[in-house]
């Protein structure tokens, strides 16, 4: 099919030869493209918007042919959330709580601990006996033990694939968005659990933690002089083994028990010898628990970087561990079997993921617990190979050593759990207490109800999809109208009807109506012609309207469009004729004045005028494209039209007469004007003999006289006050001339206005008076103290020489005289200088002015500040910010030394016209205060400096983001300072940090870190590490 524009031209080509009054039904149907050939599927790739008979590519392809019924819904099979047979239940990861999930699974599979927790008294039994379940209330555990009871019961008998541990995590007060130290959390929770169970009356419950996890060792110190042995016995719940420099678990245990020599400054005070003696110290294992927890110290403190790091060394360990060689008392069995391996995936100590490999004590099978996902290992052996291959290899990493039968190697294991062999064999079934089972059954019932509800929703969606499929297959084939009776329906509605993701709404054709409530010819591109049979079914099923039959073809609109098209064609011919007439030489002086601007754009104005006529036809019944037309919108459009100049109005003066400016108009012939007048009958008409506006002539003469007078006044004032105009040789308090007794003050506003007039007297009004009253307070006093003028004061006042003041009094009307006199006080040489002002200072108002100035400096919006980037070896930040080894000032020698290095930084490669910026340090400001008043406070940028627009209420963090875009320095690499003060509170506003307009902030960027994992560590360590402060693990 031809492009839409070609179809548009073809639909109206007949208008070139047919007059409006000759339009027939055939012409109307051609304009509405009734008889265009329909497109064929497979040949037409996409829908032809210019052809109302093209019904291809409107969304029908997804319904034709075979359809997968799963596409009718977006609901997953609820049975996917069901627990698999002979499998375990997973735990939801709440964000960064995977380390908690691994410990919960390990503790759950400790049958003795689970049995003891089930024996704890609980408010849950009261809940099940009372009206809790019958009343439909949700059970809320109150204590840590109750949370574990309920969790373990669900893990044991729930029908769900995974459960939510958020109640338990909230009870501990853990932050689910922050990953904590897994090794520390294990110790703290074990301590909390023991403390909680120690209050139980049942000894099997009270002592379960000690019986299962508690062992004893002794710190034994032997004096080398007398041989005296001292012991310090201590309990342990896990052994913390150093892995650095070791390859096997047995080596780590041997180092843990290794004898240490105490010599030199580290000698031992022997109570028997009553003096410091050389000695040996070691740890002796006195007794071992049933469950032996071995912590592999993978996360250690790095003294060089100042934060934690992970040791990724491989450690070998066996499935069977004989601890007899390491125990002092040899009686009994000390052979342990591996029951759990806790893994940390990731190279950083501050991020990663935790999983657990745990052995089922009843079946002997190994399972991998990864939050919601539980995977059973093939066979009866532990398999760690997949986990060890997850991290990306690097050149510095060592190869994985070969492991023999019954042994394993891991660089990610951080905790090994061994069970005593006798304990491993003596396992019994643990039954869920009846009161807990009742809660589990209730949760299972909710889950089953949810499964039934989801299955029903899936079934309903599939049934609807099938019905829609049959409807589309039936109706789509009957959509083409051919030569049958037809109607028009919007393309958008047809597309939504074929879109399975959105419900079908009633048909709405209002947007396609013209002012005569018929189908607008211009809207045919968004309409489709369908058979009357299909339209009847659509309207009966979905409703809507209005129905657009063959009677909806609007003859009035077609006739009007024909008229406008013919006028546009005529316009093209007349445009050529007028151009030729304008080029021809005029005979005689008779003609008409036409504005040059109007002559350049008359064709465009005529076209717009024709388009407006077309638009007015749409608005004639109060609608635009079928939408109500508001009065407010019409008023705004009229106002805009009034502001735009119509044809030949560009030569009208303000009084509505012919303008006196001859450069803006030209004379055209009578014939040319006649052609133009056909299109603009209401245009102003000015024959060649028409006189210009008399009022404008009078004003022009007066303006010329005033301009000459202003120039004369400006020249006289400039000659009388040359230094004041050029801002040269200005007085200042620090260099008070000896032959001058007094200085005078005028407002800066007066100076600015006067200089503006003198520079451009023709465009400005002469300044007639000096308004010094604005510098005085309501009490008539002065609001400035001259020994301590601020930078803001200097923007308000200017000092004047006595000779200049005399001239000012002659040239201007002065309302208030403000005079400063300097006197020497005291006999000491040099004497102290004082300044006396007339009128006198008003202390209260001066204080108020200073407060207001400070307030204004800290309450600003869209003010300019400057950020100056310094490189590492520049000296500019050394003095004022020693913490960053930087300063806000530098000597000229320092600048010269730093120049070669500064040029290496791309932010320093800026042109500054070869000028050097003045000092902006504290010293520079002190010098400024000594001068008190200076002419220009304009900031001069230098290399490495960029201007930023900021507001007082934006935070330092937001400023750092702006700096990041300007300098390509990440916020965590930015070290900022102002006047020697480090800016480090990201939440503070710029106003509170003392950043005022025109401030210069120094930026020192940290060197980029190539190791992205290390960069993550830096990000984490920048935040104060609080560990488990404020959580339930510390008893809070």
UniProtKB/Swiss-Prot annotation:
Region (Disordered): 611-644, 881-924
Localization of this protein: Cytoplasm; Nucleus; Cell projection, Cilium
Phosphoserine PTM sites in chain numbering: 887-889
Cellular component terms (Gene Ontology): cilium; cytosol; nucleus; postsynaptic membrane
Residues with N6-acetyllysine modification: 957
Keyword set, alphabetical order: Acetylation, Cell projection, Cytoplasm, Hydrolase, Nucleus, Phosphoprotein, Protease, Repeat, Thiol protease, Ubl conjugation pathway
Compositionally biased tracts (Basic and acidic residues): 896-907
EC number: 3.4.19.12
USP domain mapped to chain residues: 89-421
Keyword Phosphoprotein: yes
Domain of life: Eukaryota
The DUSP domain, residue ranges: 460-554, 569-692, 712-825
Tissue expr: Present in the brain, in particular in the postsynaptic density and the dendritic lipid raft fractions (at protein level).
Catalytic residues of the enzyme: 98 (nucleophile), 353 (proton acceptor)
Top class in the EC scheme: hydrolase
Residue ranges annotated for the Ubiquitin-like domain, each copy included: 930-1010
Substrates-to-products reaction catalysed: Thiol-dependent hydrolysis of ester, thioester, amide, peptide and isopeptide bonds formed by the C-terminal Gly of ubiquitin (a 76-residue protein attached to proteins as an intracellular targeting signal)
Stretches with biased composition (Polar residues): 618-628, 908-924
Oligomeric and partner information: Interacts with TRAF2 and RELA. Interacts with GPS1.
Family in the record: Belongs to the peptidase C19 family.
Classification via PANTHER family: UBIQUITIN CARBOXYL-TERMINAL HYDROLASE (PTHR24006), UBIQUITIN CARBOXYL-TERMINAL HYDROLASE 48 (PTHR24006:SF722)
Protein name stated in the entry: Ubiquitin carboxyl-terminal hydrolase 48
